[in-house]
């Protein structure tokens, strides 16, 4: 068996002239494009390398890296590269929180990086926000309540050993 590593994944460019891609999203375009980017990095409905696929690969596949973590000016093309999980000013996009939700929920005092349980509600509740509420979390259970006296919806993480550790949570309208 040969071990291998995917050097670059996630860019998903449709052509190399316009450089358009569902993974190239300016943070200023709003929450819906950023949700599309995060979903593409997490799990796609078509054959493509994504985080879920990396987790489903055999042990000989030791991982992979995104093309670039930050948006930046490229120099060779008039448009900036917008495929980062943070913008050029290091402000997080929604895909950043999707990746944070993949870390273990157990707090590790040995780490200097942010760690432990996390929940991020990826819905701005504007008139243009999706009706379904997307949540990124590494917790076993997440409860969502809209307004004080509203009904609570509860998500229980499935007990599976395949795929990404914490699937994207979608609370339906």
Predicted ranges, named:
Residues 1-97, 112-124, 150, 156-157, ...:
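Substrate-binding/catalytic cleft of secreted carbohydrate-active enzymes
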Residues 100-143, 165-172:
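Surface beta-strand/loop "capping" patches
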Residues 144-148:
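Conserved aromatic beta-strand anchor motif in extracellular beta-sandwich/beta-rich domains
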Residues 153-165:
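Short beta-strand segments within Ig-like beta-sandwich modules, predominantly Fibronectin type-III
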């Amino acid at each position: 068996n040969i071990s291998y590593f995917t050097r670059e994944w996630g860019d998903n460019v449709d052509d190399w002239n316009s450089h358009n891609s569902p993974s190239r999203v300016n943070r200023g375009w709003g929450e819906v494009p950023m949700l599309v980017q995060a979903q593409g990095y997490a799990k796609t409905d078509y054959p493509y390398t994504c985080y879920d696929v990396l987790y489903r690969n055999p042990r000989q596949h030791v991982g992979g890296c995104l093309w670039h973590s930050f948006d930046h000016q490229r120099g060779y093309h008039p448009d900036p590269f917008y495929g980062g999980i943070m913008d050029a000013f290091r402000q997080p996009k929604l895909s950043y929180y999707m990746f944070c939700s993949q870390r273990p929920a157990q707090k590790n005092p040995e780490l200097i990086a942010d760690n432990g349980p996390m929940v991020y509600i990826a819905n701005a509740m504007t008139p243009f926000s999706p009706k379904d509420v997307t949540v990124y979390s590494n917790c076993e259970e997440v409860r969502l309540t809209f307004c004080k006296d509203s009904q609570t919806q509860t998500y229980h993480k499935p007990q599976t050993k395949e795929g990404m550790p914490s699937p994207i949570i979608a609370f339906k309208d």
